[in-house]
């Protein structure tokens, strides 16, 4: 019946919804179960497994020694059915609610204890510590010291009990397991919340079942103290995920870190209390009713959500959470006894579920003492919103009564204590548990005299914004009210937030309690991040500065300001939700042009101006008329009106924060990665740099622990400050604190300010540089003056563009760069160095926003001249890392080593580590051979993968194009296959090669030297750059006439001999280089055997780029060769570097031609067979490798094993293979095919000398590259494959 959930972190904090409060420590678990428990009276508890069991367990922990048959029953039932559905074991068993001996409780535990979530986490860890056999005194873990304190009746004096509670809470803090875990020295002390288990009762329960079955976890509210994110449930996992993802920037896939999660929950709790005014009393308050108040108030306060208790036949069966949002008033209902949850607006399904699944629970709550019930019901009616998730538990919100002083000032709250056993009530039925609203004072008494006496002594003149329930007045003004800001603080603040929440229902709920309280309200602009918090009385609001902000900065008249109670920022439209849009500041005067149309739509009382007074934030002037208020500002405070102080805190409510973040560009401080999606930058840091970046600032940490420590020490403190400010405002109404969020959005509504063009002070720039070098010091936040911040809105455009002109440090935009990076970036961006020192607008620059590097405010702006910037770091490792990452990004300077494309959906690596496009990579993976270039067609640099076509209408027309690709591809493949020659690709994209029209080689050299400053591989890049620009040219060469060449072949000596020989060549350079050994054929290319250059033709000149000329040259040469066989003879004076190749005639170009030398090879050699038998490399199917028919092959060549020319013995027009019977339509394909036939047989592979059985076997062998291993090939003197 009970489904056990075993989340990594258990929320033991509250076994029952009531226990939510209990974790607070105010009520012991027993108290949490009080209602049920009492209802479950020990005898009846058998069926009431949840509450009873929990109570028993609690009682167990409280009094292990006293067994009671009824408690035994309950325990049995719990054990048998685990009906409770709670996963927590009884405290005595070391269950989730451990009962620690007094000494076991530690402050650490207490901290963990502080919040239910934390408790949940710690609990599983520490629960084993609970000793069933703890002494009753030690065991008495009234979960909160409050219970101890609560019982004035107790033997201990209230003060003593309070002290005890404090001590326990301090100890319990460490436990964090559950408030219950705190042992109270006074075993008899009933759990707080007035759940007063009589000692005997508790003892009986405790002793009854040393091994009570684990109870199902009760539901509670989990809330992020940073942004207000919250939910209602029994598992803190989502809260931890949220915190990790949105506040630590950690990916949840790396969640397996129990220690970090525990710390997060502990932090969550500690922050909550640190925000509280009574932080100094945290230890006591953790277990005090105050905490109970805080936690229980959470459901009510959370973003306008509140809980609706669902009862069936008088039994509290679950909770409905009303969540006003843009989807309407949605509720989700959850069963109190199991995890059954559904979304909807009706509790009918929950009631049916309860009757079907938990029929045995029906009586459980009925037995609860009627005394408590009536009060419970009454209180529920009077304070519906305050009802805690566990209405069945007495001492919960539904029973809470506000205690007021003579002047109607709320001073505290009381909850009736429900005795466990009528026999043990001893006339204390009327006893209630009281706790102070302003501190952690609590007591048990039959009257409120003690509380009032305490209030008179301690807080006589103080009214702090504790519970700010009354928002009715502010409802009409809800548009400016943002409840999220204060969500993180202590109960008082929490309640304050509630006040802020604009939902009317919530306000109504609170109206019963304390409309008299001072409240802190956050006002925020709907269009930008202007925000401030004010403390004020219940009947006034301080909206003047906001209205003036709207009018002055956004040109929005107050009458047109919209407000929706369900959309905190007011940015909603009727179709998005069911809420009513109001115009809270509309004057509704018929002569007002702004209200003319509004009057048609506004409901009569929407403005509510008559009910609420507007107070000036600079003086005590109040008026119900907004117009009068604005006139007051203009007449009295005009000079000071703009003096709004911003709080330095940058961790504000989540509402505006996230939307603001989206508009900002995020740049990596370690490389040039830029994105507008914050999650991507966090992921980039994790994956690319193996570090974690703080979401709130530019701090990066090597591990999650240090990141959490940074967050705790820096940003949590900031939060505390903000909260404190919010509350202090109550006492200093004269100052408005604007709370800038982490990011600032800039709207076109902003008028440009002259300050935009002013240079930033040197101190600002220096400070930023210091911070960069120091590696993310947080001092920026304190150093940056409020004046700097005040200009944020004016300079927002610069900020968004990443301009260092603004003190980005103060905005959280500063992304520090390491010293070496900064230097190289400064070098690289020297043209724009001055931009770093000027706060000039960037509008005039025709460069993408991304061209500016946010992270390098001091000369770090990226130069827009170069399309891509390469990260240069002093360390080779980081350099290589960033380069490899850079290459992987689309269009960032890498091109395919096989087909030279720069555009692909995915970059892959070939066997040698070089980058290849997706198509080439997949082809090579599938066929074990590089992708033939004849199936690659490029259009504007983009590959068009087409089918091979054997029939071409105009073969001549395609020769040039194919020739280029054939040469590029064959050379590329040669290098791909050669591990010796594989090097990292050059970083220049084709845009450098083709778009930079440098007319002479000297300019290429200059370009190379320029590149030198961009990359750490300076010598390599220089040679690569030169080689690319010099050797790319053979692809577009123009030769007037081959016969004209009469110059000295010596011209072919390579200009870039030294550089070109660099093994770290570019993808193109490798095509131009001869193989290391004439016979060496790197593996992988189907046409590698033809790739060996014969000699360096002086074919490089920028002017020869015409495809037509290139084609004309080859056509002329093709025609000349058959009729001029002497051209194929060795030219005596030719410096032929590859003696084993048939020499081509040397063509002398005009003297101004720059010779590239022997590094160039051209497609001419494709038609010539190596003189040695089969030096050709592994041959992929020659049919596939269609090369342009540049030269007519002279039939099957007779191979002579000397350095002589291969002569043709067949008619040159014969293109049919005599062995395979294949007829080729062009001579080159025929030559390629014939070169695969060895000399020892018709079907011998010339590459590996393998003898195939027939032509099919031979064709398969060649196409698939099934050559024998390298060792055997080498042994036979054949080239390695």
From Swiss-Prot:
There is a cross-link at residues 29, 76, 263, 418, 457, 474, 488, 645, 737, 755, 766, 825, 850, 877, 879, 925, 937, 965, 1003, 1012, 1030, 1040, 1070, 1192, 1201 (Glycyl lysine isopeptide (Lys-Gly) (interchain with G-Cter in SUMO2)). This is Zinc finger transcription factor Trps1. SMART domains: ZnF_C2H2, ZnF_GATA. Residues 1050-1059 have a biased composition (Low complexity). Its main location: nucleus. Sumoylated. Sumoylation in the repressor domain inhibits the transcription repression activity. Sumoylation on Lys-1201 is the major site. Appears to be sumoylated on multiple sites. It is linked to Tricho-rhino-phalangeal syndrome 1: Autosomal dominant disorder characterized by craniofacial and skeletal abnormalities. It is allelic with tricho-rhino-phalangeal type 3. Typical features include sparse scalp hair, a bulbous tip of the nose, protruding ears, a long flat philtrum and a thin upper vermilion border. Skeletal defects include cone-shaped epiphyses at the phalanges, hip malformations and short stature. There is a cross-link at residues 766, 1201 (Glycyl lysine isopeptide (Lys-Gly) (interchain with G-Cter in SUMO1)). There is a cross-link at residues 1192, 1201 (Glycyl lysine isopeptide (Lys-Gly) (interchain with G-Cter in SUMO)). The lineage of its organism: Eukaryota, Metazoa, Chordata, Craniata, Vertebrata.
């Amino acid at each position: 019946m009970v489904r056990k959930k075993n989340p990594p972190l258990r929320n033991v904090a509250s076994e029952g919804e009531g226990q939510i409060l209990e974790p607070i420590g105010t009520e012991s678990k027993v108290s949490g179960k009080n209602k049920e428990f009492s209802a479950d009276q020990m005898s009846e508890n058998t069926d009431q497994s949840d509450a009873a069991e929990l109570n028993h367990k609690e009682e167990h922990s409280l009094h292990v020694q006293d067994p009671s048959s009824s408690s035994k029953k309950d325990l049995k039932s719990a054990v048998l059915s685990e009906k409770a559905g709670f996963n927590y074991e009884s405290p005595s068993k070391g269950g989730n609610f451990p009962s620690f001996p007094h000494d076991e409780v530690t402050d650490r535990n207490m901290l963990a204890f502080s919040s239910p979530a934390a408790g949940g986490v710690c609990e599983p860890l520490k629960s084993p510590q609970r000793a069933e056999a703890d002494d009753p005194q030690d065991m008495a873990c009234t979960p909160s010291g409050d219970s101890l304190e609560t019982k004035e009746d107790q033997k201990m004096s209230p003060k003593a009990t309070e002290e005890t509670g404090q001590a326990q809470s301090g100890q319990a803090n460490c436990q964090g397991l559950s408030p219950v875990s705190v042992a109270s020295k006074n075993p008899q002390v009933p759990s707080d919340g007035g759940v007063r288990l009589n000692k005997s009762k508790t003892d009986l329960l405790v002793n009854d079942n040393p091994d009570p079955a684990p109870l199902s976890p009760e539901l509670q509210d989990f809330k992020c103290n940073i942004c207000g994110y919250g939910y209602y449930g029994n598992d803190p996992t989502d809260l931890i995920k949220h915190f990790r993802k949105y506040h630590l920037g950690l990916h949840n896939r790396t969640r397996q870190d129990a220690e970090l999660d525990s710390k997060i929950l502990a932090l969550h709790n500690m922050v909550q209390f640190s925000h509280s005014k009574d932080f100094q009393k945290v230890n006591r308050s953790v277990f005090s009713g105050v905490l109970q108040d805080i936690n229980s108030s959470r459901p009510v306060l959370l973003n306008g959500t509140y809980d609706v208790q669902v009862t069936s036949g008088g039994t509290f069966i679950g909770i409905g959470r009303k969540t006003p949002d843009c989807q309407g008033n949605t509720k989700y209902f959850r069963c109190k006894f199991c995890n059954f949850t559904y979304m909807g607006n009706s509790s009918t399904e929950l009631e049916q579920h309860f009757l079907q699944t938990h029929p045995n629970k029906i009586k459980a709550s009925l037995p609860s003492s009627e005394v408590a019930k009536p009060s419970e019901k009454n209180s529920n009616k009077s304070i519906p919103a305050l009802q805690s998730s566990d209405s069945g538990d007495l001492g919960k919100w539904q029973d809470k009564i506000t205690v007021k002083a003579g002047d109607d000032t709320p001073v505290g709250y009381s909850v009736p204590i429900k005795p466990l056993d009528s026999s043990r009530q001893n006339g204390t039925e009327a006893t209630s548990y009281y706790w102070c609203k302003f501190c952690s004072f609590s007591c048990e008494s039959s009257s409120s005299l003690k509380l009032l006496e305490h209030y008179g002594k301690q807080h006589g003149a103080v009214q702090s914004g504790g519970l700010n329930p009354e928002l009715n007045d502010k409802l009409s003004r809800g548009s400016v009210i943002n409840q999220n800001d204060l969500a993180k603080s202590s109960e008082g603040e929490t309640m304050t937030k509630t006040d802020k929440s604009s939902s009317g229902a919530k306000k109504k709920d609170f109206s019963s309690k304390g409309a008299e309280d001072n409240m802190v309200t956050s006002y925020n602009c709907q269009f930008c991040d202007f925000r401030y918090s004010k403390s004020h009385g219940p009947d006034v609001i301080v909206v003047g500065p906001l209205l003036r902000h709207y009018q002055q900065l956004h040109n929005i008249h107050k009458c047109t300001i919209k407000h929706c109670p369900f959309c905190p920022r007011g940015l909603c439209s009727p179709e998005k939700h069911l809420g009513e849009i109001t115009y809270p500041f509309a004057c509704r005067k018929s002569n007002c042009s702004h209200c003319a149309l509004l009057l048609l739509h506004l409901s009569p009382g929407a403005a509510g101006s008559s009910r609420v007074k507007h107070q000036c934030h600079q003086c005590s002037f109040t008026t119900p008329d907004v117009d009068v208020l604005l006139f007051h500002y203009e007449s009295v405070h005009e000079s000071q009106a703009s003096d709004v102080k911003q709080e330095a805190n940058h961790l504000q409510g989540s509402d505006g924060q996230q939307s603001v973040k989206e508009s900002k560009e995020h740049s990596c401080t370690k490389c040039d990665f830029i994105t507008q999606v914050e999650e991507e930058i966090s992921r980039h840091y994790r994956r690319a740099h193996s570090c974690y970046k703080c979401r709130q600032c530019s701090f990066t940490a090597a591990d999650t622990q240090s990141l959490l420590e940074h967050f705790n020490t820096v940003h949590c403190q900031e939060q505390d400050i903000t909260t404190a400010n919010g509350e202090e405002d109550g006492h200093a109404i004269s100052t408005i604190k604007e709370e800038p969020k982490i990011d600032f959005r800039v709207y076109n509504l902003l008028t440009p300010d002259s300050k935009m063009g002013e240079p930033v002070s040197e101190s600002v720039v220096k400070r930023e540089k210091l911070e960069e070098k120091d590696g993310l010091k947080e001092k920026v936040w304190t150093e940056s003056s409020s004046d700097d911040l005040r200009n944020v809105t004016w300079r927002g455009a610069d900020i968004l563009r990443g301009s260092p002109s603004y003190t980005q440090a103060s905005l959280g935009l500063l992304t520090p760069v390491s010293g070496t990076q900064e230097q190289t970036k400064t070098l690289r961006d020297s043209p724009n160095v001055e931009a770093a020192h000027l706060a000039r607008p960037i509008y005039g620059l025709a460069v993408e926003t991304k061209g500016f590097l946010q992270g390098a405010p001091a000369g770090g702006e990226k130069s827009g001249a170069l399309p891509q910037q390469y990260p240069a770091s002093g360390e080779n490792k980081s350099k290589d890392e960033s380069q490899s990452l850079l290459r992987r990004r689309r269009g960032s300077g890498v091109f395919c080593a096989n087909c030279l494309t720069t555009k692909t959906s995915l970059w892959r690596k070939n066997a040698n580590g070089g980058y290849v496009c997706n198509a080439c990579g997949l082809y090579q993976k599938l066929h074990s051979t590089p992708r033939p270039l004849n199936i690659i067609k490029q259009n504007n640099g983009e590959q068009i993968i087409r089918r091979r076509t054997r029939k071409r209408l105009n073969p001549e027309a395609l020769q040039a194009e194919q020739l280029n690709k054939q040469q590029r591809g064959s050379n590329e493949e040669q290098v791909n296959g050669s591990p010796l020659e594989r090097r990292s690709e050059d970083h220049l994209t084709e845009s450098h090669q083709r778009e930079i029209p440098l007319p002479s080689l000297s300019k290429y050299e200059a370009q190379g030297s320029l590149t030198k400053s961009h990359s750490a591989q300076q010598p390599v890049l220089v040679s690569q750059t030169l080689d690319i620009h010099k050797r790319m040219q053979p692809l577009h060469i123009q030769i007037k006439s081959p016969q004209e060449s009469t110059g000295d072949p010596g011209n072919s000596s390579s200009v870039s001999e030294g550089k070109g020989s660099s093994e770290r060549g570019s993808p193109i350079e490798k095509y131009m280089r001869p193989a290391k050994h004439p016979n060496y054929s790197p593996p992988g290319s189907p046409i590698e055997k033809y790739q060996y250059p014969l000699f360096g033709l002086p074919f490089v000149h920028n002017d020869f780029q015409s495809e037509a000329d290139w084609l004309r040259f080859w056509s002329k040469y093709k025609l000349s060769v058959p009729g001029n066989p002497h051209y194929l003879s060795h030219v005596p004076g030719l410096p032929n570097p590859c003696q084993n190749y048939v020499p081509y005639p040397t063509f002398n170009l005009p003297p101004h031609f720059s010779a590239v030398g022997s590094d160039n090879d051209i497609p001419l050699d494709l038609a010539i067979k190596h003189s040695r038998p089969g030096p050709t490399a592994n041959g992929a199917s020659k049919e596939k490798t269609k090369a342009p028919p540049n030269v007519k092959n002279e039939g099957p060549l007779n191979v002579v094993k000397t350095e002589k020319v291969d002569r043709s013995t067949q008619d040159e027009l014969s293109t049919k293979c005599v062995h395979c019977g294949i007829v080729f339509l062009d001579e080159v394909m025929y030559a390629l095919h014939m070169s695969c036939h060895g000399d020892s047989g018709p079907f011998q592979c010339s590459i590996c000398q393998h003898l195939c059985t027939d032509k099919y076997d031979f064709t398969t062998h060649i196409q698939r590259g099934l050559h024998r291993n390298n060792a055997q090939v080498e042994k036979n003197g054949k080239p390695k494959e």
